Amino acid sequence: MKSIPNVLTLANAALGCGALFFIAILDFDTATLCVLLAAVFDFFDGFIARTMGWTSRFGAELDSLADVISFGVVPGALTTVMLTTMNVDYPWIFFGFIITLASAYRLAKYNTSENSQAYFRGLPTPANALLWIGVPHLDYDLTFPFLLGGIVVTSYLLNSPLIFYRFQLKNSATSFVLVLLIMLSFLFLWMRFGHGALSLAIIFYVLFSVTYRLVAKSKG
């Protein structure tokens, strides 16, 4: 039974590998599904391990390796493929893998730092991956400068000192209402924008976290 979290972690990694394959053949719909499921498994492997008291150093290291694949290599490969469709010169094509390097650095820093249970310092790698995997589905003609700017900004956010809100499952009315509002809002976005809703949801999450932090600081 104690191996359940590790099995879920390996499922996360397997889905990341699957996403890479589907990105390579330009099947972004299936790649998006793989990353979304990988994020679900990533949530539940840690949740189950903490709830049942099954946390271990091995599990933490395995989780980081899986996250590098699903939430580091995948968005890096995706942006690289997107750059190739813009007829960008070769040195610039590989610029997308800066996301991979920034993600790996963040995960290593996360594993060796004291982490709060109330918030994340820097944008979580799953959130960043979900942001990028939704981009090809947005009804917007991407330009090279826009994509380049997005790569730089998100790579910074991954390792920034900014505080990001950490949603937690709690037995309280406030928590229930907040989760319900988030689910309804995401459902509305999904009905309107399809898979592109993932990108919009993460953008809203970033804005919400920054606003929440500013309001909290203003109250002392």
Model-found features: residue ranges?
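Short, amphipathic, aromatic/basic-enriched membrane-interface segments that mark the entry/exit
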Residues: 1-7, 60-65, 113-121, 164-174
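Helix-coil boundary and interhelical linker segments in multi-pass alpha-helical membrane proteins
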Residues: 18-34, 73-97, 133-148, 190-196
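C-terminal membrane-associated helical module and adjoining short loops/tails
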Residues: 120-220
